[in-house]
Amino acid sequence: PKIKWTCNKARELAKEGKKTIIWSYFRNNIEHIGKYYLRDLNAVYIHGGIETGEVGIENTRKDNIKRFKDKDSDCMVLVANYASCAEGISLQHACHNAIYLDRSFQADLYLQSEDRICRLGNEDQKNIYILQSEIPRGVRNIELTIKNNLERKIDNMSKFLNDPDLKQMAIDESEGEMPIDENINMQDIKSMLDDLIKPR
């Protein structure tokens, strides 16, 4: 459901002429979305396995980023992980929409990823979507664990560096909707887990 929602949202934004960066920690997600699911939006993708290369050499980081940043390009989506698109890449003039399909525990790279489209002084409206799987009330999952740890780490970094702006720069998720689905119960979760660990 998260990948389907992500692709639908990217298409919706593209119809409005808006580019989107999709963040994922997982290489398979990055490749499948970039190669197959969003081919119609001429998506490009980068991760650690993609050569840095040069502009003009197809399927290199530099060329894919240039294609995405080009306002006249029909490339409407960049799919990436934090590490491959962390430092020195500025996207705020080309893109104002980010979707976090999933996240990792690395607070520094998470903040840098937000900074790709949210530069100080740039007043354009930004839309950042952080997706979490729907769960029954009272059940914890890895996405909530990551969310809580990121908040704690950002708070600690802010205190350690004596930089209250650091905490303000991070997206305040307390205003977002909690992904609670009252229709999912413990038996549904047990069935999903059984399917995942079933020998193939």
Model-identified regions with their sequence ranges:
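Conserved helicase/translocase motor-coupling segment
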Residues: 1-39
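Alpha-helical elements of Rossmann-like donor-binding domains used by nucleotide-donor carbohydrate transfer enzymes
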Residues: 5-9, 32, 36, 63, ...
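Conserved helicase ATPase core of P-loop NTP-dependent helicases/translocases
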Residues: 21-23, 40-85
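Cofactor-binding loop segments of dinucleotide-utilizing enzymes, especially the Rossmann-like FAD-
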Residues: 25, 48, 103, 131-133
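SF2 helicase motor core recognition
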Residues: 30-34, 62-65, 72, 76-102, ...
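Short, well-ordered coil/turn elements that cap or connect secondary structure elements
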Residues: 38-41, 123
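A conserved SF2-helicase RecA2
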Residues: 105-200
